[in-house]
Amino acid sequence: MKKIIVTGGSGFIGSNLVKYLLKKKYIVINIDKLSYSANPYNLKGISKNKNYHFIKSDINNRKKNIQIFTKYKPYGIINLAAETHVDRSIDNPNNFVQSNILGVYNLLESLRSFIKKNKKKIKLVHVSTDEVFGDVTKGRSDEKFVYNPSSPYSATKASADHLIKAYVRTYKIPAVISNCCNNYGPNQFPEKLIPKLIFNIINNKPLPLYGKGKNSREWIHVKDHCSALLQILLRGKLGESYNVGS
């Protein structure tokens, strides 16, 4: 059975991905520092699954990363460890720089050290966002779309994408990038738009309006995203980016 590390596996997308991979008969190692948006309850009921392992750790901790790689020798890593809320990034961009840029840098350096010492490849799927493309006024963005981030959040994710590509080219790190649209589904943190709208409607509260109310957004169910991430891990070409949408 192949072993897959999921970083940020106790969050919204991460917890759904962990469950999806377990159903597909993979051994899953969940690395999560359990920040405010992570919730161990998301994975209630699978802690006794012999194919599931949880490690509380921060991907900025290189020593711990290498210890985990050495112990489990995974086939791949799907990196979901990130700060993701746009409004929070405007209020406090520092946390986003620490997690989304430095976290990816330290994860890459950990991988580079492990691969150099052990001569064993571990494929990395870095989960990014379509927010890196900024406002798309016509049609759809594709993988060759020019980056134009418009918030501290999207700027940090764009920076991480460029780091990934540079490490693939410079150090031959086996990595790919996915850029996905907005997700919805079970276990989503209530600050996100769809659960927030539902909560406000139920409680007769006003609905948030962004811009003039004429903007359009694309959503994908989180389980479809999980399916795409596994296919990118198994079939994605190293150094490439893959847009994921509905």
Predicted regions and their residues:
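Hydrophobic residues at beta-strand termini and immediately following loops
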Residues: 55, 178, 209-210, 244
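A short, basic/aromatic alpha-helical/loop segment that forms part
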Residues: 170, 216-219
